[in-house]
Amino acid sequence: MALMSNKTAIESILGNFEKKHVDAIYNAAAQTILSHSEFRNKHFAYSLNSYQKKIASKVGIELYPNGYLPHSHPLSKIFENHLLFDVLPGVVNTSRLVMCSIKESKVLVFKGIRDKSRRQVSDLNALNSLNNSHTSFINRLVASKDVSRYTEEADAFFQSKKGSPELFSRNFIKSLENKEAVFFHDEVHHWTKAQMFSFLKSTKVKRFIFTVVYPPEILKKFANSQNPKVYDFKVDKGRLFFFPDGVKTEAYEQKLNMEWLFSASHLRSGDCVWTVTRHKSIYAHHLFEISIGELVTDSKLFFSDYNSIDMSKIFLDRFRSYEVFPISIEHLYKVYSYLLCLKKPDLESGLAKLRQIIGDDVEIKEFLFFEQFCKRLIERQTSWGLFGHSFFEKLTDMALSSLPNSIARIFPQWKKKNTFEFLFSLGTLVVDVERKVCFEHVLEEWGFEVVITDENAYLDPLSIFAINENFNEDRVDDGYLERIRLPFWNLNDYDLKRKRVNAYNILSYRFEEERKIESAQKGPNKMLQIEWYGIKEFKVDPFISNSITEFTLLEALLGKRIDPKKYSYSKQACTLSNYLTFLCAEGLDGFNLEEHLERRLKAAGHDVSDDEEEELTSAEQAGPIKILADPLGFMKECLEEIPIETEPSLEERGQFSTDYHSEKFEINYNDIFNPHNCMNTHGDEIPTPSDGNCFFSAFTETFEVERPDTLRSDFSDWLMEFNGGSYASLAEMIRPNGVFMEAELIYLFCVFRGVTLIIHDRTHEKENVYAVHRGFEEGHMVHRGNHFVGIETYNISTLTSDPLLGDIPCGFSEEITKFHFRPDHFNCAQFRGRKAAFITKVDADYGHNGMVYPHNSWVPSLEEIIQICGQGDDFNCALINFYEANSSLGFHRDNERVYNDDPILTVCTFGEGRFTIEFKDQVTSFLMTAGSFFLMPKGFQKKARHSVSNEMSRVSITFRKHVRRLNGSPIAIREENYKNTCLINAFSKAMKRSKQAIIAKLKTVNSPFWSRYLSEGNGGSIEDCQSACEALDVTVDLNVNGKCVVLGKGALRISMALRNNHFSVINAAQLMERTFVSHLLEKGNVNVLEGFDAMLSGDVGAAGVNKIQFAANFEFARILANSFLNMTTGICLGKALDNGEKYFLHILKDRVKQIGIDVTMVCGFAGSGKSRKLQSWLHSRKKGNFCVVSPRTNLAADWAFKLELEPNEQRKVSTFEKFIKTDKSKLDLIVIDELTLFPNGYLDLLVYELADVNRHCQIILLFDPLQARYHNKMDESILTFEHDVDRLIGGQNIEYIYSTHRMSRYFNRFFDVPCFNQADRTEEQRLWIFDDVYSIPSICSDRQEPCDVLLVESDLEKKAFSPIINVMTFGESQGLTFNHVCILLSESSAASNEFRWMVALTRARTRFSLCSTFLGGIEEFKVKRKESLITSILQGEKITFNRLNLMLKCNLIRREKENGCRDEVDREERLEGDPFLKPFIFLGQRVEKDEDEVEEVKIREPTCQTHLYITEPNFGLCYNFDFIREKEQREYREDMLVTNQFCDSYDKVHINGKRETPGPLRFKAIYPKHSADDDMTFWMAVRKRLVFREEEENYQRLSRAHLVGGLLYTNFKKKMGLEFTFDQGLLEESINAFEKKKLEKSCGTIKSHSIRSDIDWALNDVFLFMKSQLCTKYEKQFVDAKAGQTLACFQHLILVQFAPWCRYLETQIRNQLPEEIYIHSNKNFDDLNAWVKKFFQRDICVESDYEAFDASQDEYILSFEIHLMKDAHFPQKIIDAYIDLKCKLGCKLGHFSIMRFTGEFCTFLFNTLANMAFTMCRYEWRRGQPIAFAGDDMCALNNLAVCHDFDDLFELISLKAKVERTETPMFCGWRLTPYGIVKEPELVYNRFQVAIEEGKVLECLENYAIEVSYAYSLSERLYEVLKSERQVQYHQAVVRFIVTHIDKLKTKVRDLFLEQSSDEDI
């Protein structure tokens, strides 16, 4: 986080350059600024406030630094100068410029700028020619102020005719006539539109450039300024009064209506057209240009120089403008977000926040608005949101929207909805103006009614929302202002009725004009002046369509593309009538109207014969009259005459685009060979003969041509007549057969045919695609060298009018064919006619119809294909299909649950196939060839199905985005969202590697396992820790419940603990018994059994592991074998069809009746992780000989996915039938998963086979004995013997894992099993019970928890409810996992056994619900079930472990797994009162460090008694009488201010206080007291302790100080012997220590300081105040008034950012300091006492004190700190932020110089370091010489010699030391002696007396007793220290006082004073 500023890469590296290089870099900038300074000083040096500076800089104006020129409206003046002198010279590129309405002085400045700029880019000859610049100026008198502005020459152009409508005199027009460029300054806003046209037509200037002043918000009907600090205005009766900078006395009056100018893209008068260009807009100042000709210009203008909310969202009354005070959007967002952050928001907090934001810019209207806004927000909140509505809420919303607001506002839902819509639709004000052609002959009026808002708009803003239609723009106001029956008046209006009337008025006006024309034949051509730009606004309104001449509208729509000789007016009118009737009948909107009309006209029209010419003429003459007389009848007549479906002839198609208008045709070279992005799919090239006619042959293959043999001659004939025969020469040239077609001829041919030709140029290796002409039909051909060939082209055409399927993105790229994929590259699934490989780069799986695809890792080439297609890069999975020839895939939808309705990309890399799409009842197909692709967009799968058929082999890739796994669990969880990763965190800290690096390594070893581990967020077990050890190659000593388990086998050994479900790192394992887990097996070893038993039996895997001897029964095996052969069990081992007998040869012969075998069982609760450790073990031993046998295909696929088996290793996972067929002779291990689902006798059958082929194979059985046993209707009467599981566990004690990773805490209300799933569920969430199955999907969906499956007991129920919801039987669901299941309570389930119910109750992760269809209801169901699991749940009883144990014939021994999944939330709770600090404190799991306590041996020194003399009573008062002076003499006075530091009375009464002395002689009067209300003391502190300087000077001084700072640090580092290496662990500990320290405060304290966390508190702004204190230092006794101590309060973010780094630095330095260097902190007096005893040398000591120590820590000390930080490996961004903070720091008093502040982060550390650096330079210090440091205090216990090596340095730095050499040194208020430290007894005595006066003895007794104890413990040796009688007196008095209050002491110091006998005892 950048604290003060963000730096670019170059700015960041500048700090590493040498000073000369930095100076050289900045020298260029200095020269540039110098070159600009003279000009900027004259025109941009006006004095601006900070806001105005910000505004000017934001719009890109270069200001003169520190402007000083006063001006009445400086900002507007700067805007004007910027347009004139910065922008205008770049716009005018001609020297022939005439400037008008501008002072001569400004013209001269403008000419100077232009001459200077041209001089820089011209040579000498050009320079000479510039001397003849033709820039001139002409002024005329228009306004009264012009008389004083311009010279008397302007009078010559004054229009003196009274009442003349012309604004310009003849002389003036003549002087500007035919000029190349004319510029008007700030005059055009006085003109009308008519005057603008008059000027343009009269002068005929080529370029008319002008500035205008006009507030853009008027265009959006705002009647007052939305930038009141920049400008203001007032609207009054069609006049606009503009106030620059809001200054009313400088007002300008001008015309209100300038809408015609801003909304005009072109000006048109007859055949003359001008283009309007807006060059620049700066708030209300604009620069426009009008140039001759019809050029491309902006279709819209945008004005966004606003920071207020768009109040038009509120005031939606039609046809009115409102006076609205601008409400800052920034203020609104900040107040709104602040209130949301508060747990208990209140009105006062919101308004206080607003007051803090706006500072001194208080506006009462804004306060009134926010007062009501905050009230409404607090009272009603904004519960109405975007998502999560129930069906009922949606209905309520629709009803409220349709009600009048007067009724709707009664409902509380409306008010919440209203607030939400206001906030949701809120945006910054942007004025956008739609531009169109402005006609001269169309008169304009602009409706503008101002509605002055009253106080209600601010007292109750929501009532204004109510009046203004609740933002529902579909509702129409019935009232509107008087219509102005003139065209182009507000054509696009809110009101539909008014819009129709306006449109009708325009048409009526045009028809009246048409009737005046004498020649009716010219009528339609004349009507072309209407043009499409006006007609298109009518939107084909039926109101208009019945009132307009149809063929006239058609011509206006299609422009000049209609050939009147080809299409009769009757046909045109009929075509239009038919289509308009169709539009009205269907209720369509007329989208792409002109294209549809062209297509229909093309179908209806035909060549005009000689006989028809008469009809044509008569129609031309009578048509308009007839149609106007009876338009509907004429339409009907035309409709009967000509069928609209008539297909056009060849000639009609070929000549459709012929232009017969008077305008001359010119070849548009911009329309020839334009680069084109072809999105069609192409097949093979179509060869053409190389006979010179290849173009025509290819054209014939591309387009349907009826007479291809005459194509060349028809084209030649057309050229002869086209454009008046101007292309006759080309016609003769192209007529001969074999003449090659070239560029212009190809273009003309496309014009002739009216087509668009797409040419694929494949002459070179890279294909280029070009488009020629824009016609009605598109075709493709290939150009290779000088030869044209055809090409097969396929386009996914529009299926229906449905917009979803209208245009499916598709394309083709040759690069795709370069990618080659083969089935043997991947682990494929086999289907009929195809193989498919599923590839993913996330933890995803995929399957359908009961099968699961094998897993393949992502390959980089797929990313390249995605990039080539360019259809998005959000795909994370791909399915590669390898189709065989003549294969197909039927109609289907890609709508599996693993993904949402996201786009799906299909790419064909090899071969070709036909893709068919079925939508509703329509079917369309297209061919996909190699290199083609298309995208099925979002929503496609819901509306359409698709199929594929292939005649030849083909490779297709389908890219998708998977969001969840097949079981419903989410995937693609972002790393920062991982939960319960204390195991990962522990490895990260122990190995000193980042968490990301640990995760990356784990995923490379076993991606499925660790991806699922992180996604589920259920924490880690001991087995997971072991897997991590093997993956990371480390050895972990894991401390678990007092035992130490050794995991892994690696060179690196670390110690961890698992306590309270939390993994943490410990320094070293304690001495305890260790259990070693075998690591005999290296990764990759083929012997899968080596170390396996040790893994199972060790402490890591012991939970749930049982060793049991199983007695296999031959009879049971034989029965099952016969059942397989008879196909009553299984389907693929039949005797007849499958030759199954060969697999049971070992059973057919006689065998012993029983065989005993030792098996290993792992038993555990559902989701307990029974298979997890085995999967981890086998994953690293995939080369071993093992096989996992699963009862179902989907379970087997899950094993294969987690083991990441290669294609040739798939045999290692098998279903139970396939496993019977496999060879078992080489297997070392067989894992049977979910044994309860295997048929009875399967284990017997397997044991007898192994007895023959492999006696050494080990069998592992995984099952939950509480789950249902195998059941099959076909063999239930055959396999009647007891199931293998029950025979195994019968009468045994079974270790059972009683915990679950599957189920959430929701299930703890039903079971007492520990649930490790961290889903957001609680036990309190109620059980849902539904009354019928039909309501389950809708209710669950509304509750945001859709039901995944309905579990039923019988197949009959499954069939009945399958159409409604996904249904499974209890048995089918066994082994599967869902998020939410619903269990059906019915007659069938009431008869089900407890094991099957256990299956149903344990299938869900987050919730199960119930649905009752039982006849009689829930109560009868409970009676039927009696005592059962489901009955307990219905009665609210928790199912206990003991209750489950009773279900079995064995004894389950409960074992719970330790799991690390504890997250801490106490930090968040502690920060509840400071929401702004919360984001900056780590709220996750803390690093818990256990440190071994080392008990130190304490040496007890001998104590001896001493005699203390009894002092005289009140002896202290005698001394005070001599030393205390009058208060008047001690206080400081300046002018009328005087300090108040010394008390001389008992003016303040203290509880329990005593008055033992007169007021002037009070002990409190000994010391100066600083109070916050003492202004003079504060100003003394400011003068003494603070230095102010501008930040620029601070930076300059710092840049010059680095040499001295470097010397200081180099010397310091050398003498201290410091060497730094970065320690990440120490940094994390420092961060944690800081946060813990911060949060040790109470919640109340944190909340009371929350204002310091306010995000709006500027980081470089401190709150400065004076510390209130009684200065009870020994040296402050009896002194005069002293300056106060200033404190600086910093923003909390500063502390959060820097404090941990300072802790880190302090620890690093302390660890390296020699023991003779002591830093005293944290009031640890024992350490100081021990250090003094050890190093005191009875020598002369050196003490140093500093003058203004804080203020003296200037840029040199800062440079020293920077060098230290860099050497300590601080990040550069931290150093840069620290520099910025020190240089930019300020408060309300101004900017500070670089200095230290009390209250700054780590003030003590940096003070101490500065003190040490100074001392090391000042004195000749050698190793072994003891020195104590503490902030600005220093005491050396040797007589150090002064060093003169740095004398020059000391002349530069501000630090000045006061040195004292003494034999009785003082340090931090302690006297240092050979026997330790002693506190000055006089100081303690006086403090006690002050406490007695104020009644605070008990508050300080303990601390003072501790201070005195050091002297008291010296006994008789004290007399060597206290050498004066006065000191002994004070000491005796203090000790006696403590002894008399000894019963009040609580700490161990009490024992010291009790050991001594009193005088009375002797």
Curated annotation (Swiss-Prot):
GO terms for molecular function: ATP binding; ATP hydrolysis activity; cysteine-type peptidase activity; dioxygenase activity; metal ion binding; mRNA methyltransferase activity; RNA binding; RNA helicase activity. Residues 1739-1846 form the RdRp catalytic domain. Binds 1 Fe(2+) ion per subunit. GO terms for biological process: DNA-templated transcription; mRNA modification; proteolysis; RNA processing; viral RNA genome replication. ATP binds at G1164, F1165, A1166, G1167, S1168, G1169, K1170, S1171. Residues 1122-1297 form the (+)RNA virus helicase ATP-binding domain. Specific enzymatic cleavages by the viral protease yield mature proteins. Keywords: ATP-binding, Dioxygenase, Helicase, Hydrolase, Iron, Metal-binding, Multifunctional enzyme, Nucleotide-binding, Nucleotidyltransferase, Oxidoreductase, Protease, RNA-directed RNA polymerase, Thiol protease, Transferase, Viral RNA replication. Fe cation binds at H892, D894, H946. Residues 874-963 form the Fe2OG dioxygenase domain. It catalyses: RNA(n) + a ribonucleoside 5'-triphosphate = RNA(n+1) + diphosphate; ATP + H2O = ADP + phosphate + H(+). Pfam families: 2OG-FeII_Oxy, Peptidase_C23, RdRP_2, Viral_helicase1, Vmethyltransf. Residues 1298-1445 form the (+)RNA virus helicase C-terminal domain. Coiled coil: none annotated. Its cofactor is Fe(2+). RNA replication polyprotein: RNA-directed RNA polymerase involved in viral RNA replication. This is RNA replication polyprotein.
